[in-house]
From Swiss-Prot:
It holds the Pfam family tRNA-synt_His. This is Histidine--tRNA ligase. It is an enzyme of class 6 (ligase). Its main location: cytoplasm. Gene3D superfamilies: Anticodon-binding domain (3.40.50.800), Bira Bifunctional Protein, Domain 2 (3.30.930.10). It comes from the Archaea. GO terms for cellular component: cytoplasm. InterPro entries: aa-tRNA-synth_II, aa-tRNA-synth_II/BPL/LPL, Anticodon-bd, Anticodon-bd_dom_sf, His-tRNA-ligase, HisRS-like_core, HisRS/HisZ, HisZ. It comes from Methanosphaerula palustris (strain ATCC BAA-1556 / DSM 19958 / E1-9c). Keywords: Aminoacyl-tRNA synthetase, ATP-binding, Cytoplasm, Ligase, Nucleotide-binding, Protein biosynthesis. GO terms for molecular function: ATP binding; histidine-tRNA ligase activity. Belongs to the class-II aminoacyl-tRNA synthetase family.
Length: 409
């Protein structure tokens, strides 16, 4: 028996209904901010990803050659593809551009809870805006999208300018190692490394910055910075909305990717793989041959959101089970079509079993049953049975439809 590939999943109808419902809530949340959906190919030229991340990323991707010998890769994320599309197709459009996306991505990594080889991202890119308002908007869009799902989470906001200031006088290799320790939250290891590297003087300011809970505490460590005004303005805009967040000036992800504001969000019940969103301000368009378009964006790990939510109660729609004799089947198709035209789900029994057996099957899922026998065919009516109360009445097709609709309210 052929099995599905490792790191992938099958979704049965109940799961898909839950996923579509949460996806729909997120789509509606970002739509209210003016974000419009875009889509890119599932596979891209390999260089799209290696030109920014280096050749080392190849081991983490699904890479192949097509019949023309071109090196291609299944997309491991969406931002690079969306910026490639901007450079190819949309540089002349009026900015800022508010784009959103929902799509599957692929990474060759060890599968575990909340981490898969095929996974879905929901995200936005705000292209062509370089202000505190742009930073605040994208954070709020992410917060709205996540909270629309019903998930409570912890939002952490930082700014790479403060950490870069403290590390301005160290070499690139040292900076990378410091950020790697911070990213892994190996603070004891960081202290030992700084002492070994002759940089013990950095231990105190780094420790104080990591412990800072307010902007005043953070700038007391760094002193005045050119970015301070923008950071404080962003904070004022966020505070005006009442959004719940805290500061983390030790966010070290994407040092070579993000240019200023960064943020992350963590579910409270996922353990080690608890991060559900990451984003920030960046400038990538030039890397792909475009103009220097400042951008802000985020990506939500949709699968982790679903894991964190647990069992999702979907909105149950009314179901009508249509049962009939073999002779009454043409009329049954007509009746079922009338319900569907009115927006009601109608399930036809396709077996040749008797009416009793068909009715018993319908009662397992349907709210109403429509019985069609010789009498109903002759009179052009139906027998409508409420499966919750057991009452049944001979009515016209139109009245049956109206009765079910009224019972759905």
């Amino acid at each position: 028996m052929v099995q599905r590939p490792r790191g992938t999943r099958d979704f049965l109808p109940d799961e898909m209904e839950a996923r579509r419902m949460i996806e729909g809530r997120m789509r509606e949340a970002v739509r209210r901010w003016g974000y419009r959906e875009v889509a890119t190919p599932i596979f891209e030229d390999l260089s799209l990803f290696t030109m920014r991340s280096g050749q080392g990323i190849i081991d983490e991707m699904y890479v192949f050659q097509d019949k023309g010998g071109r090196d291609l890769a299944l997309r491991p994320e969406l931002t690079a593809a969306v910026l490639r599309m901007y450079v190819n197709e949309a540089r002349v459009l009026a900015k800022p551009l508010r784009w959103c996306y929902f799509a599957d991505c692929f990474r060759y990594e060890r599968p575990q809870k909340g981490r898969y080889r095929q996974f879905w991202q929901f995200g936005v890119e705000l292209i062509g805006a370089d202000t505190a308002a742009a930073d605040a908007e994208v954070i709020l869009v992410a917060d709205n999208a996540i909270r629309s799902s019903g998930l409570d989470y912890d939002l952490k906001i930082g700014h790479l300018g403060l950490m870069k200031h403290l590390l301005a006088d160290v070499g690139e290799e040292v900076r990378r190692k410091v950020m790697a320790y911070l990213d892994k939250k190996e603070f004891d290891g960081l202290k030992d490394y700084l002492e070994t590297a002759g940089l013990a003087a950095l231990t105190d300011p780094l420790t104080r910055l990591l412990a800072a809970e307010t902007l005043d505490e953070a700038f007391a460590v760094t002193g005045p910075l050119p970015e301070e005004g923008r950071i404080r303005e962003m904070a004022a805009l966020l505070d005006a909305t009442g959004v719940r967040y805290s500061y983390n000036f030790g966010i070290a992800r994407g040092l070579d990717y993000y240019t200023g504001m960064v943020f992350e969000g963590f579910a409270k019940n996922l353990g080690a793989e608890s991060q559900i969103v990451g984003g920030g301000a960046y400038r990538l368009a030039q890397v792909f041959g475009g103009d220097d378009a400042p951008s802000v964006g985020f990506a939500i790990g949709f699968d982790r959101v679903m894991v964190a939510l647990g069992e999702v109660q979907t909105r149950k729609q009314k179901i009508v089970g249509v049962v009939s004799t073999a002779e009454g089947r043409p009329f049954a198709f007509r009746v079922a079509n009338a319900f569907r035209t009115a927006g009601i789900r109608a399930d036809l029994d396709l077996s040749d079993r008797g009416l009793g057996a068909q009715l018993a099957r319908a009662a397992k899922e349907a709210d109403f049953a429509v019985l069609i026998g010789e009498r109903e065919v002759a009179t052009g009516t139906v027998t409508l049975k409420n499966l919750a109360t057991g009452t049944q009445t001979a009515v016209t097709i139109d009245l049956a439809v109206r009765t079910v609709i009224d019972g759905s309210r």
